[in-house]
């Protein structure tokens, strides 16, 4: 029997984009001000243009353990969009995945990374994503809105998939 496929977004799901950017701005306001859109003291997603930003991200709490648990019963793939204004984003994201999940052929995401701004074109059973953009809102399988009311964290996601088995 084939395992069901889960696509996992990176920014805001595996990697803590907003939290890391907020911390970097608080610690170094002069360094990031030029590349930052600030509204009421909070850094927003335009920060994806900061060179090297994706390599600085910390994992979302619980993400690493959850991925390892899910990989036992599901085929996992990263499905992430790339910012048009950051030419190094793809390389930084691949290096981030290697750092946290390993580089060898036994790594859970070895040759399982897809970059696309059309997530609705992916064929699979589940998509874990924090935003309804880049085609996520039209994904043909079940979408788990990470950080939302039903799936606020990785514990809630794991609970859902434990019921699905």
Give the predicted meaning of each segment.
Residues 1-51, 142, 150-152:
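Active-site neighborhood of HAD-like aspartate-dependent phosphohydrolases
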Residues 5, 108-135:
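Conserved Lys-Pro-Asp/Glu-containing loop-to-beta segment of HAD-superfamily phosphomonoesterases
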Residues 15-17, 23, 78, 85-89, ...:
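Short catalytic/ligand-binding loop motif for oxyanion handling, primarily in non-cytosolic enzymes
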Residues 58, 63-91, 97:
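Substrate-recognition element of Asp-dependent hydrolases with the DxDx(T/V) motif
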Residues 87-119:
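Active-site donor-binding segments of glycosyltransferases and PAPS-dependent sulfotransferases
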Residues 126-159:
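Acidic, Mg2+-coordinating phosphoryl-transfer loop and its flanking beta/alpha structural elements
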């Amino acid at each position: 029997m084939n395992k069901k496929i889960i696509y996992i977004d990176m920014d805001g799901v595996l990697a803590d984009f907003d939290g890391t950017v907020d911390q970097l701005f608080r610690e170094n306001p002069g360094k990031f001000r030029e590349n930052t859109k600030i509204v009421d003291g909070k850094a927003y997603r335009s920060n994806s243009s900061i060179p090297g930003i994706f390599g600085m991200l910390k994992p979302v709490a619980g993400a690493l353990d959850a991925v390892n648990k899910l990989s036992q019963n599901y085929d996992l793939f990263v499905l992430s969009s790339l910012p048009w204004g950051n030419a190094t984003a793809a390389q930084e994201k691949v290096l981030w995945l290697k750092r946290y999940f390993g580089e060898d052929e036994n790594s859970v995401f070895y040759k399982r990374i897809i970059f696309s701004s059309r997530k609705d074109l992916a064929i699979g059973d589940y998509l874990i994503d924090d935003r309804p953009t880049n085609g996520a809102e039209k994904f043909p399988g079940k979408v788990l809105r990470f950080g939302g009311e039903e799936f606020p964290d990785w514990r809630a996601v794991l609970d859902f998939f434990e019921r699905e088995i």
